[in-house]
């Protein structure tokens, strides 16, 4: 990377009562062949807990013979392995599937291979029909979801939002109980009484108002953040990330970005934690708590969620992690952490055919792989037992569930599913612990020299930001997959069940950037948000604050000689997406030869409405950093991972570290650093200030 320019401004995020109208769905046109295939894919996600014997997938799947069609797969060995496991006995139907359990995961990978190595779409579809009819529902959905995302001939096809596929993973038992009662009564016996409990009917939909977990049931301060940790868009985002790059995924086998996988892992969690930290700050909670494997963890968690047969395990406050049941796991976790520190102290790592120099910035790939403990860390020649994985063991210990009853039966915890992990405060404490270990590696990197930082002839002269306001709005999603329907109901297009809750959003805003350039050049502009003060109101230094930087946008621009004025609207920020479109609307769009653009091309991005943290009534100060550097597109062949790796340079949080840790040495080579100051409810000259108005709650029972 060559040269970085920085502009730091103080901004304040505000909370407003204004609720703007939803934006128009951005779509793209598709041909008739695409529409036919897309409808076939979507058919697998309807009424997922039961079989529709009248559907095409059932008629094909019940008689499809995989062995007789062996020539229609590009990897016969993988097909033979699947058949061997299938004949031995796959996971029974109706049991809960989790990828964090050995036997269930091995079977799901074998099934994914069957899908992945299908020679053409027709074979892929028939294989999916077979699995939909004969295999466990959750296991099928997991493998099929990833297959659609990863198969080259499925590029552009839409998969439904995870909260429509697995609605029970995105709402608590209170809402489920309302849905079950309504379904069993075949509607609302007494509409007036139902309305008092937040249930009403609109056309062909039953709507259920839902609260987030509150202080009555969730008796520690973490409940203030449930509007964020239980947000269905954020939890779906995490599931998309796993589907994009599963921890068991072998890059050489499936063709993923092997050279930057660990970098992506670190970047994803650093950004997720920074975003979570923003919410902690604006809610007065401060830094993410730390914990010890040998001491009780202060933060309890009560999921109030259900599987088909059991409730989720609960973890009380001050839960003792180091119990007799966990002795072996805790010993492994502690040893794994100490081993990494020993690697750093030696300055290098050498094993599994790898030789890593920790002074090389590219060593971040190994470091990230080490903490994800993924398949690329060891290579194809090493058989990896993921039951002795750091992440798997840590999730098991913190989840506080009892030991599994057998290879398929377990009491789940929120940590057992990617759809629910973000709901547990211990999740953030665990990954903050991992990221802090990775940051220790950063201390071994050399600071940038002047020739690496200086963008010759280019200087940022000014940045202005519109007023920033946040608000809460109503949102509904289709929860029909949480219940069973009769054959007649399925045939006659049954009434849909909608779960309704509030969610965080913000008003659109512009960022105005002025750049003086002596040369015409292709440049990259990055914008990052960072806190100005810690939870005690003490200004944060750049050296100590770089891990809290949250990337807002990345884009290329052509600089001309002279003054360049750049106006960037928040709706253009490329690493965010609009909310997913319901399946019912997707089917209507397909009839018009269209699909939602964001769900087709940018499904794995963070929801656009969550780019800003919840504001406060008086305004909460943040800093905006703007960087400009030359565009380096050499060797960029990273699709479909462009959502994580955007150019040939290291990701923002990686190259910013040695810059900021040593920035005082290089002030002379950085064109300009602005540090605006402002005060709440004031307006100072040349400051970027955003005022807030009072928020009006949409549901009076919900208190944030």
Curated annotation (Swiss-Prot):
Glycans are attached at residues 72, 211, 681. It is found in: Secreted, Extracellular space. The keyword Cell inner membrane does not apply. Its main location: secreted. It comes from the Eukaryota. Pfam families: Hemocyanin_C, Hemocyanin_M, Hemocyanin_N. InterPro entries: Di-copper_centre_dom_sf, Hemocyanin/hexamerin, Hemocyanin/hexamerin_mid_dom, Hemocyanin_C, Hemocyanin_C_sf, Hemocyanin_N, Hemocyanin_N_sf, Ig_E-set. GO terms for cellular component: extracellular region. Fat body. Keywords: Glycoprotein, Secreted, Signal, Storage protein. Residues 1-16 form the signal peptide. The keyword Glycoprotein applies. GO terms for molecular function: nutrient reservoir activity. Belongs to the hemocyanin family. Larval storage protein (LSP) which may serve as a store of amino acids for synthesis of adult proteins. This is Sex-specific storage-protein 2. It comes from Bombyx mori (Silk moth). The gene is SP2.
